[in-house]
């Protein structure tokens, strides 16, 4: 598996700043055996997170590896930008904004791909986008557009530019795309954002005192699945870079449905995980 699954998530669980000898919380202290859910149970709950981190998103730049991945934006970051832009659009205009995005996507598709009238395909795609973007961004989008509202050409162009991240996200960043365009099969039942939603939901259901351990388990599971040769050539970053990465990771995790994650989240003494991670910026 390629190195693209490395970035910053496990980093938030492995705060390698001379704190690896402490525990995630008091729940992992002397009463650990009585209070802590089983490692396998936590990992089972976090399976969507593992799947999301490993398979669903394109790579992020990893400054801690000698081999740089030049793509600056991952699936999650573009998704987050999409949600931000959509949230800034007035509620009464969101349906039209999404309609413009769909039309732009359809226009970019080869005409040979369509076996049904373009208007019907457009309506179908718009319905799918309405459902998925409402869930993905956790904001209200009307089910039906108010067709009597007329938008000028300049306003339409402005909306299309404003939702460029959404277009990028839907076309390029996830596998598979959530909108099943004609003749483009969707083989996997879950899309990137759906798996991320499951990940958020599972994480929110885990008691606060065990979330550090749960995130740590995800990091450990991902690390164990990596071929050993992928870890060669890694160098230890300087402490300021570590601190900045940890801060970004914790901030991103806390933004996921406002899930509380302790600011101090060191790894248990029994798990001395290397400094590797996957970053999941973006809202659920």
From Swiss-Prot:
Q: How is it modified after translation?
A: Contains disulfide bonds.
**Keywords for this entry?**
Disulfide bond, Seed storage protein, Signal, Storage protein
Q: Which Gene3D superfamilies match?
A: Plant lipid-transfer and hydrophobic proteins
Q: Does the keyword Magnesium apply?
A: no
* SUPFAM superfamilies membership: Bifunctional inhibitor/lipid-transfer protein/seed storage 2S albumin (SSF47699)
Q: Which InterPro entries match?
A: Bifun_inhib/LTP/seed_sf, Bifunc_inhib/LTP/seed_store, Glia_glutenin
Secretion signal span: 1-18
Q: Name one GO molecular function term.
A: nutrient reservoir activity
Please tell me whether the keyword Transmembrane helix is annotated for this protein: no
Q: What does this protein do?
A: Seed storage protein. Might be integrated via inter-chain disulfide bonds within the glutenin polymer.
Q: Which PANTHER family match?
A: AVENIN-LIKE B5, PROLAMIN PPROL 14P
What family does the Swiss-Prot or TrEMBL record give for this protein? Belongs to the prolamin family.
The protein, known as? Avenin-like b10
Species name = Triticum aestivum (Wheat)
